[in-house]
Amino acid sequence: MSRYSGVVHLEPGEAVPPERLIPLYELMNSLDERSYVRRGVRMTGGDTLATPEELAGWLAGHHLIRSTATVTREDVNATRRLRTALRSSFTGTTTVLDEFPLVVRLAAAPGLEPAADGVRGALGTLAATVALAQADGSWARMRMCAAADCRWVFYDGSRNAGGRWCSMASCGNRDKTRAYRRRARDG
């Protein structure tokens, strides 16, 4: 049975990430930077984890904390720092996540565990998931949309792992149309 009970918000034609990457996918896209018009509707973006209450609901929805746990403004700020570090990894920026230390477990079931409890432990669990996904290669399929007016993080499910846009139907089409018009205009 799945531990995840939320709803994944995918772009049309977007591949579903592996289940263990879904919380990371949603964390990175909780900061929506889209600023284009699609079907007459302006995408305005926003931050869906801006308050302690929103963060508490999101973490509890992913079974990372108990629904009765206390979440503070500093927890929101720490979550934003983790999200920023993860999103910046797609632009070639390397960030050290010293704030979320992990413990290596060498036992019958080896793994990585957060060194803290509560919200910090939940964020450490997300950081550990990134480390494990890097080790198994699935993190390499997480990408940031190449469209400058989008920056949505997506899972590249293409056979050759060469996807550039979160959706070929929207962002890919817009980018290719712009390039065509630019070439036609410039001769």
Cite the ranges covered by each PLM segment.
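Basic DNA-binding region of bZIP-type proteins
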Residues: A169-G187
